[in-house]
């Protein structure tokens, strides 16, 4: 598996269970002409909130940064819930 495919796999391995647990949706765009982006939302429709936005020129770096952002978001969510 090349670096790009491995980065995508690592992101989805982390993202899928977290998305199911918190009701997340992901939108992404990659292109050879401009920077790629990944946006992750909580909720659906008019009530959805963007919780993560990553932009990166290199697609492999994009997926790696998104993976780190998802992990960080879940950890902060767990900390907030633990304080309640």
What spans do the regions from the language model cover?
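Short intrinsically disordered terminal tails
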Residues: 1-6, 71-84
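Short, intrinsically disordered, low-complexity terminal segments
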Residues: 2-4, 16, 43, 63-66, ...
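Hydrophobic alpha-helical elements and their junctions with loops/disorder across both membrane
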Residues: 14, 26, 73-77
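Acidic, low-complexity, intrinsically disordered interaction modules
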Residues: 20-68, 72
């Amino acid at each position: 598996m090349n670096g790009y495919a491995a980065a995508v796999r690592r992101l989805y391995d982390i993202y899928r269970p977290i998305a199911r647990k918190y009701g997340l949706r992901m939108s992404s765009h990659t292109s050879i002409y401009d920077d790629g982006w990944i946006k992750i939302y909580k909720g659906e429709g008019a009530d959805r909130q963007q919780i993560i936005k990553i932009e990166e020129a290199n697609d492999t770096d994009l997926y790696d940064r998104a993976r780190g952002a998802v992990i960080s978001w879940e950890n902060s969510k767990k900390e907030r819930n633990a304080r309640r």
